[in-house]
């Protein structure tokens, strides 16, 4: 008579038939709505667990009105406190601690892909740069999706400026206070060629010859040093020579 919780009923084949809310050892047929059991809630109707209730449900729970993510009639307390996505009404929504967070703007990972969420909902219309938590770093989003493997020079708006920007590992690094150090920081390619990059932006005003070099590992013990010479005219690389200097 001391048991209070959910009890499962099985058919003659041993398969679960349904589940019921038991209070003090007896099925409580008078219970309707959300019932708290330990650290989670269940939704019952005339004492029976509504196991076919799934997805987002609008309800007032513990005095808090909101949209809640329900799994087979059960609302779990998500103590991990991270964002997940849940599909409802043609949209994907950001859920935090089992509740839709309409104030959230940022990224949420789902099935190995990071999505851009705006005001609690994945914005599939978003293509362009968005702020990140890292200083001077902007993530490039295509149709709401962030692709960390994306490289290239793309035309977009960044901080109110429309220009050609370098995207590397899905991000553009651009500082409002960066100073010219005498040569391009790096180079980025698109369908029109290879371009000189200064402070994350294609530098159309750069013309000249620029030399760079880097080491490449060829084994645990050995590496090679490659020297690069770029000829640049109005930001476009017109020729590039690579020379292996030593090994």
Label for each model-derived stretch:
Residues 1-247:
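Extracellular adhesion/carbohydrate-binding repeat motifs centered on closely spaced tryptophans
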């Amino acid at each position: 008579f001391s048991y209070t919780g959910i009890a499962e009923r099985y058919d003659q084949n041993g398969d679960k038939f349904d589940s019921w809310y038991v209070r003090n050892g007896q099925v409580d047929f008078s219970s309707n709505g959300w019932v708290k059991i330990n650290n989670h809630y269940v939704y019952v109707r005339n004492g029976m667990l509504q196991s076919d209730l799934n997805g987002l449900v609008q309800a007032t729970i513990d005095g808090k009105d909101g949209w809640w993510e329900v799994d087979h009639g059960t609302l779990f307390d998500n103590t991990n406190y991270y964002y997940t996505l849940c599909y409802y009404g043609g949209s994907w929504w950001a859920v935090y601690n089992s509740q839709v967070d309409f104030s959230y703007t940022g990224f949420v990972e789902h099935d190995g892909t990071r999505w851009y969420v705006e005001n609690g909902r994945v914005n599939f219309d978003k293509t362009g740069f968005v702020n990140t938590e890292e200083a001077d770093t902007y993530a490039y989003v295509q149709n709401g999706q962030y692709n960390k493997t994306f490289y290239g020079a793309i035309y977009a708006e960044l901080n109110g400026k429309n220009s050609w920007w370098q995207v590397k590992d899905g991000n553009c690094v651009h500082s409002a206070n960066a100073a010219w150090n005498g040569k391009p920081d790096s180079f980025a390619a698109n369908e029109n060629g290879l371009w000189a990059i200064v402070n994350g932006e294609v530098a159309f005003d750069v013309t000249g010859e620029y030399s760079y070099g880097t080491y490449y590992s060829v084994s645990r013990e050995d590496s090679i040093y490659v020297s690069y010479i770029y000829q640049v005219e109005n930001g476009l690389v017109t020729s590039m020579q690579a020379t292996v200097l030593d090994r």
